[in-house]
Amino acid sequence: SIFSNFFNMFFGEQTDNKEQKSKKNKEKVPIKGENIETEIDVSIEEAFYGLEKKISLRAQNGKMKTFTIKIPAGIRNGEKIRLIGQGKKGENGGKSGDLLIKINIKDDKKYALRGIDLYTDLKITPWEAALGTKVSVDTIGETIFLHIPQGIESGEKVKIPGKGYKDGQGGRGELIADVKIMIPKVPTKEEMEIFKKLNQVSTFNPRNNL
């Protein structure tokens, strides 16, 4: 009918205009850029003292961009450092995202980090274990002397308070030394004679208690 044609022509145009305006406004809404995540490895001592580290990442334009990251002393394994506004660019005037760098603290030949405690292997000789002794142990930043009690066994742990990793409150965790009794792989003739003599005179048998 004439009325329905008029209605569709008038109100239909209004509806189309509203949809177009809505779409146009939506396109102009600022959208924040996405974050970029990456990770880097640092040593236990680097994390303990803190450092500046450079990393290079490929930017959106395809070029490499270098960032200087300040890693605070005592950072925890798995923590993330945030560089604000260094992520992907936003749209329609939106802010850029952030760059998040996860810190992986890697164990090394000296130490293994577990929480705020440092673990290290303490290798001693059978006679040191039998007689007791004093041995030097490297900790972060210093060397200390550790008393080994007479009769200590392989697998026992000696704990040194305050010589571990930073606890974030001005203190430190423990340094835990895992005792490993080592024998000479190629004993000298004299050592072999002593071992044979010990075998003859000793009544000790660790298997008696099994």
Q: Which residue ranges define each predicted feature?
A:
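Post-J-domain flank of DnaJ/Hsp40 co-chaperones
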Residues: 1-60, 91-95, 199-210
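Glycine-centered tight beta-turn/hairpin loop motif at sheet-sheet or coil-to-beta transitions
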Residues: 35, 60-64, 139-141
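Intrinsically disordered, low-complexity linker/assembly segments
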Residues: 66-210
